[in-house]
Amino acid sequence: MSSSDNYRLDGKVALVTGAGRGIGAAIAVALGQRGAKVVVNYANSREAAEKVVDEIKSNGSDAISIQADVGDPDAVTKLMDQAVEHFGYLDIVSSNAGIVSFGHVKDVTPDEFDRVFRVNTRGQFFVAREAYRHLREGGRIILTSSNTASVKGVPRHAVYSGSKGAIDTFVRCLAIDCGDKKITVNAVAPGAIKTDMFLSVSREYIPNGETFTDEQVDECAAWLSPLNRVGLPVDVARVVSFLASDAAEWISGKIIGVDGGAFR
C-alpha cells in the first residue's frame, strides 16, 4: 500500500450531519471524492441535500440523503439505523449540524439557551453515542467545536461558545470510552468560514459591524489570520477527511483548530 492510499476512503461509509449546505456539504463532498459512500443528513432542505448527493455521485461515489432532527435522540438512532440498513455498515460519522446565537447575558432567555444547547451540545452527544453503537471497529467520530469554545472570549457569545466548549470535553472523555472498539474521537474547531451565513454572522463579531460593507467584512476577517484570507468550507473538509482516514489512526481525543492561526 502506498502512503497516498492511507488517505483514501474506498470501501468506507460515512454519515455527515447538517450536510445540506456550507461546511457540512463540503465535508460530504470531500469524503465522497476520497472514495467513501456518504449519507447526507439534513434537517429541512431536501432539495439542497439532494444537490449534494448528486455532486457526490457525479464524482464517482454513491450517496443518499436522510432527513433527521439531530436534536432528537430517537431521530438520531433512526438516522443511523437507516444508514446501516441502506449501505450495510458505517465507518465514519462527522457531526456538523449546529446553530449560532448572539446575545448579552441579560437578554438570553431559557428558550434560547435550550434551543442552542439542544442541537450544538445535546445533539452532538447523542450523535456520538449512536455512532459508537453503529460504527464498525476502527471507526471515526468527528465532532464540531469552535475556536471561540476555549481559545478566545467573544462578547454576547456565551451561549454559543459554551455549547461548543462542552464538545471539547466530550472529545477527551469519549476518546477513552470508544477505545474498546478502536474508534477514534476528535473534533474540528473552525474559525470564520465563508459560507452563506458568513457575512451576517461575521458582522456580529465585529464592533459596529452593521456599518461595514461586505468587502470590509471580508477584509476584517482576513486580517485576523496571518495568512490574510478568509477560511473556506473546503479548509475544514480537508481536515475532517484526514481525521477520517487511516493516516489519522493514532490521533484521538484532540480538538483541531481550523482558523488559519486567527486565535493564537
Curated annotation (Swiss-Prot):
SMART domains for this protein: PKS_KR (SM00822)
Binding-site residues, NADP(+): 23, 69, 96, 129, 160, 164, 193, 195
GO molecular function terms noted in the UniProt entry: versicolorin reductase activity
UniProt KW keywords: NADP, Oxidoreductase
Disruption of the gene: reported phenotype: Impairs the production of sterigmatocystin and leads to the accumulation of versicolorin A.
TM ranges: none
Family that this chain belongs to: Belongs to the short-chain dehydrogenases/reductases (SDR) family.
Role: Versicolorin reductase; part of the gene cluster that mediates the biosynthesis of sterigmatocystin (ST), a polyketide-derived furanocoumarin which is part of the most toxic and carcinogenic compounds among the known mycotoxins. The first step in the biosynthesis of sterigmatocystin is the production of hexanoate by the fatty acid synthase (FAS) units stcJ and stcK. The polyketide backbone is assembled by the non-reducing polyketide synthase stcA by condensation of the starter hexanoyl-CoA and 7 malonyl-CoA extender units followed by cyclization and release of norsolorinic acid.
Protein name in the entry: Versicolorin reductase stcU
Name of the encoding gene: stcU
